[in-house]
């Protein structure tokens, strides 16, 4: 069977799997589990593969699941990855498949990622006698919370002998039929900083006798923006956001301490280093001016997701020739973080976005919103692109 004929047959079989995809996705949506707690989700995935007769490894790097599908002829080892953890958010959707777990929901589409990859695995397994190479399905736990599940799975051998990896994220603000993929950085390094300011408290009526931690902290918050505008090359991109400012005191008491917590985002490692150093320089200077002291910690989170050029071109070419794909665009890099970055630091590959906006505009909500949902037809698009990229990779 020619590769083009095989691809059409696989797409036809994926069409036949769509109702099962929806059923599986809705099951996960109703019974979500938080990062590092995905016991039942992992068990469901393992049971599905066992029903197909596909060899698996469980508890990979924690709760990860690996499935191996061997083609009938030698070829490259291609890995496909889907994450499966949920978020601590109360589901507010009025749909039959809304979360049944209070305070927990799939608000980022990981349920759809998993359902799509299971369908791909099923169809590849059914056609294994026509395939060249080995196909590794990586079902990853704990993407949402650092240190994440990718690195422990890699340390536990999930990429052993792997030549390339592909992954996707269903993107609920982009229309169905859209694929966004570009070489280079596509998602940012996501870091966290904590600043503790130690001043001198006192009565609100006597500010001259104090070292006001709230005033000092406020100046720090404002001055941090000067780093982005004056210390980072304008050709580069960076974000510094202070998300928490804590100085809990009665209304008439000047605070002696304040705690600032925020995030720094960047695409380039040199810029990342600049942000870490310059944040402390700002804190040190302002605290010194006021005669205050400070503690500063900077925690590096996931690195930037950086796509490899040749593999990205392959994915783009595949997507352009995939049924159901209406447009393939570069898109803009996202300031969100993703631990898929670790896979791409170890093997070649690419990460792309699959448009998944619900058909009704009033149902379109951003990721991590309590009313988040996807157009379930996007799972089929994602599955076809992933399968196509995987089975044709040996032609590169």
Curated annotation (Swiss-Prot):
Binding site for Zn(2+) 2: 144, 368
NCBIfam families registered for this protein in UniProt: amidohydrolases
E.C. no: 3.5.1.-
Transmembrane regions: none
Organism: Bacillus subtilis (strain 168)
Assigned keywords, A-Z: Cobalt, Hydrolase, Metal-binding, Zinc
Family under the similarity heading: Belongs to the peptidase M20A family.
Cofactor: Zn(2+); Co(2+)
Binding-site list for Zn(2+) 1: 182
Annotated catalytic residues: 85, 143
Name recorded for this polypeptide: Putative amidohydrolase YhaA
Cofactor-binding details, from the entry: Binds 2 Zn(2+) or Co(2+) ions per subunit.
Disulfide bonds: none
Annotated PANTHER family: METALLOPEPTIDASE, PUTATIVE (AFU_ORTHOLOGUE AFUA_6G09600)-RELATED (PTHR11014:SF63), PEPTIDASE M20 FAMILY MEMBER (PTHR11014)
Uppermost EC category: hydrolase
GO molecular function: hydrolase activity; metal ion binding
